Structure formats: C-alpha cells, structure tokens
Design a protein with these regions (language model features):
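CheY-like receiver
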Residues: 26, 131-134, 179
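Pre-recognition alpha-helix immediately N-terminal to the DNA-recognition helix
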Residues: 22-28
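HTH-adjacent hinge/linker in prokaryotic transcriptional regulators
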Residues: 2-6, 15, 32-36, 40, ...
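Short helix-coil-helix linker/hinge
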Residues: 16-22
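Glycine-rich phosphate-binding loops that contact phosphosugars or nucleotide phosphates
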Residues: 136-260, 264
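Glycine-rich phosphate/diphosphate-binding loops that line cofactor/substrate pockets in enzymes
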Residues: 126-138
Length: 265
C-alpha cells in the first residue's frame, strides 16, 4: 500500500509541470531519504529550484517544506515494521524479461492489489449515498467514456440495467456530442476518463452542464478538467508506472479499481 503522501502525489502527477515532475519522481524513488534533507538539499537532488519545491509542497496542501517533511517522517515510521519482501513484491517496472511465469503473475496481481488499496485510501465515502440517490431519481442515465474507459461504462450499464435502471453508454466522440446536446435537467451524466483529459468527454461534460445536467466523474487525477467540471467525483488510484512507461503500457489494474468503484455505487 502506498503512503497517503505518495497517493496524493501520484494523483496529481499528470497535471504537474516538468519541474514538479522531477520533484515527484525523486520523492517516489527516494521516499525514506527526504526526512533527512533540508529544502535546499532536496531541491538540489531533485534538480530544481527551492521556489519549485515551495510550490510543490503547497500544491499538496502543506504550508512549507518542513511540514511536508514531518508528514513524510510520520509515514516512514509507520512503514518501519513492514516486511522487506512485502515491499519488494509491490515494485513493478514493467520488465518481464527473464522472469518466470510465477514471478510475472505475482507482480501483476500485486499491482492490482496495491491499486485497490490506494483507491480505498482515496475514497470519499460521504458522496456514495448522494450519488446513489441521483441514480435512483434520474429521469435518464447516460455514461460516456472513450478508449479503455468504455470497459468501466459498459460495466456500469450492465450492473444498473440488471437491477432495473435504464442506462445507456456512448464511446464515440460524435455520439457523445449528440447525446450531451439533448440531455436536460433531471438527467444524470456519468463521465469516465482515467487522466480526466479526454477532449470528447470533457467537452461533453461542459455541454451537459450548460443544460443543467448533474455530472458524476470517475477519474484518477485530481484537478483534472473532468474533476473540475463534475458535481461529484469518484477517484481511482493513478498508475504512476504506466505514465513513466508511455502509452504502450496500459495495465488492467486501473480498470479493476474503477470497476470496484462502480460496484460500491
């Protein structure tokens, strides 16, 4: 399980500029070293200015670097008793060459387990009941998502349809334009985008909002456009490794976390 600080950093990573990403990369790779560093030393090791460090910790909600470092120290103390092999099994760099089928499978399963644990730690349980009530009262329920987000929208349709709710989903950009142009007050739009930046999804949300439609967003990235425009947001854990490895690597763990969020509704 990632620490609360790392979960917060990873959830904001896609929205960070280059300097902040350097800092985030250093924190994620050298978590235990930070508690011994001064702000100037931390900036030097991260390859950024002290001003960038100040902006970074304030983005995470801390007044200054010392407060951030104290939080990291508390987290490190909690992790002292964690078994080394338990920590090692959760390290995933995408390299499968030379590993046995058992090792590869164990790594993939461990990755999904950690994504679920991190998603649990990000949960805002206070919005689950209001969102469930919106689903129950909505005149019409529409889910939108492109690419692999369609996996989540299809699961949502399957679950709600089986218990008596009429819901449809759209994954084509033109269809999203059409449906969000005719939704009206009393309807519910559920929008899914892992990074929260899919243009057709975000534009669809904005279009629906102008028509008085309530929007529930499902995303991994805080402060993303989808999160900003949604009335309610369900956050799933962000896969930092997939971002570092590029678009060719799309782990199922992110979809698993979103599917479990759907089950919670």
């Amino acid at each position: 399980m990632s620490s609360p600080v790392l979960i917060e950093i990873k959830s904001r990573y896609p929205q960070m500029n280059e300097a902040m990403r350097r800092i985030a990369d250093y924190v994620i790779s050298s978590e235990s070293d930070i508690i011994y560093l001064k702000a100037s030393d931390f900036a030097e090791k991260s390859g950024v200015s002290t001003a960038s460090v100040s902006r970074f910790v304030k983005l995470l909600g801390y007044k200054n670097f010392n407060e951030f470092r104290l939080k990291m120290a508390v987290t490190e103390e909690k992790n002292v008793n964690e078994k080394p092999e338990e920590k090692d099994r959760l390290v995933y760099n995408g390299e499968a060459i030379g590993k046995s089928p058992y090792e590869v499978s164990k790594t993939i399963f461990s990755k999904s387990i950690r994504e679920l644990e991190d998603t649990w730690n990000m949960m805002d349980f206070d919005i689950l009941e209001p969102v469930a009530n919106l689903i129950d009262r909505a005149n019409r329920i529409v889910a939108i998502g492109v690419g692999r987000s369609k996996i989540t929208t299809e699961a949502l349709v399957s679950r709600l349809y089986r218990i008596g709710y009429y819901i449809v989903d759209f994954c084509d950009s033109h269809e999203i334009v059409n449906i969000t142009s005719i939704l009206k007050e009393g309807d519910l739009l559920i929008a899914v985008s892992n990074f929260g930046q899919s243009k057709s999804v975000v534009e669809g949300v904005k279009r629906a909002k102008r028509r008085g439609v309530t929007v529930v967003g499902i995303t991994s990235v805080k402060d993303s456009p989808l999160a900003q425009y949604s009335d309610y947001v369900l956050f799933s854990a962000y896969d930092y490794a997939s971002d570092k490895m590029g678009k060719l690597y799309e782990p199922s763990s992110e979809n698993v976390a979103q599917l479990v969020l759907v089950d919670c509704l």
